[in-house]
């Protein structure tokens, strides 16, 4: 979870959860500390979400029991969030966005940009305030053949660079590992081969 604050306004980017370490006995999940957000709930204009992985949406049901604000995400991400909320009997103001949309939340002008990740329908944000311009990449991988057919919009990245960025918050997962990450399309091709060779029933476990 990232909170951006300008004067008396706050926008939250993502709100995930993680699982406890082996020595954290009796703890089922780990969520962010919401105390500052709850204390300043009247300042929060909304939650904007980059993608649907658990470490980016898993905390949303918990924070929405503390504050009532709209949640903005793409269609697939919003569907995953909605399922989590329904499991807990929580109703929320969920608002669908598409890559390329522009959102105005108080003093925050937010542009959504198509990116690619290991989950479909991922976006990143170019956020402009009277004080500074911020680029939040979300989690991303350079994938020109993603499973949803929507490649990363590097042209828009270049345009944003020309407009000016004061702060960039970038994903760095596995950044120190050498080599390149294969396209998600490669995963599908491998699965096709495995399924084709299977002689009996196929059982798939998903998370």
Predicted regions and their residues:
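His/Asp/Glu-rich metal-coordinating catalytic cores
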Residues: 1-48, 53-207
